Amino acid sequence: MAVQKSRVTPSRRGQRRSHDALAAKKLSIDPTSGEVHIRHHVTADGYYRGKKVIAIKASVVEED
């Protein structure tokens, strides 16, 4: 098993962890549908930058 050569100080440990913070995802509103979506991603309706790029099939609702 690997063993460190010298003890890591709290300062060094903090410097290493400084880039580990999580950031919130960037959200946008589609100009056509008004739907909230992740930036640079297609909306659930199939719109990207105000244009329909994917034809989405209508969801099937089954009744018992």
Curated annotation (Swiss-Prot):
<dbReference type="InterPro" id="IPR011332">
    <property type="entry name" value="Ribosomal_zn-bd"/>
</dbReference>
<comment type="similarity">
    <text>Belongs to the bacterial ribosomal protein bL32 family.</text>
</comment>
<dbReference type="GO" id="GO:0003735">
    <property type="term" value="F:structural constituent of ribosome"/>
</dbReference>
<dbReference type="InterPro" id="IPR044957">
    <property type="entry name" value="Ribosomal_bL32_bact"/>
</dbReference>
<dbReference type="Pfam" id="PF01783">
    <property type="entry name" value="Ribosomal_L32p"/>
</dbReference>
<keyword id="KW-0687">Ribonucleoprotein</keyword>
<dbReference type="InterPro" id="IPR002677">
    <property type="entry name" value="Ribosomal_bL32"/>
</dbReference>
<dbReference type="GO" id="GO:0015934">
    <property type="term" value="C:large ribosomal subunit"/>
</dbReference>
<dbReference type="GO" id="GO:0006412">
    <property type="term" value="P:translation"/>
</dbReference>
<protein>
    <recommendedName>
        <fullName>Large ribosomal subunit protein bL32</fullName>
    </recommendedName>
</protein>
<keyword id="KW-0689">Ribosomal protein</keyword>
<feature type="region of interest" description="Disordered">
    <location>
        <begin position="1"/>
        <end position="23"/>
    </location>
</feature>
